[in-house]
């Protein structure tokens, strides 16, 4: 086993206060495309730039165009948790992992069995009326046709954070609390270029910061351990 992975395993074995902060790279091994890589959503050609489509203004003005993109690109069928999701759920059951803080919207951490999951950007598995806030099952939104409407006449929207929208203060504050109190902070599958989410790791006060990502990140120099490898491969060895 790689000496760096051995070090990470030792940190986890000796701790009962581990927090995991993850991004799109955690789910790519389950077949969900990321956003910013060469093959990611943001580097593909559409009628409008994906960053524009995934904005509050665009959703409000052109909900039909939004939902075409949503159903074609954001909804991925028959995906299952991978080795990273499963190991994190196992570590939580063992009393070692205190929380998963994720930028992902796919619900795979919960599907793997994780209980304490702080979804910074919401979930594609939930939806609600943009007018009266009545909650709705995601099926109508993800698999229907046209623009889904509430019984009040309002447009049903996904429970995700679009561009131009703030993060949920309650979730952010809980994430800050978990990160600031963590003994070991593992950051995985994220380029750490998305703010304000990436800025949350600045609240970590410990000396066991591990970065697991295929490519380099702006925080590599601040980490105590950097592993440039697929996160599923790393977690399958822990």
PLM feature spans:
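Conserved catalytic core of sirtuin-type NAD+-dependent deacylases
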Residues: 1-238
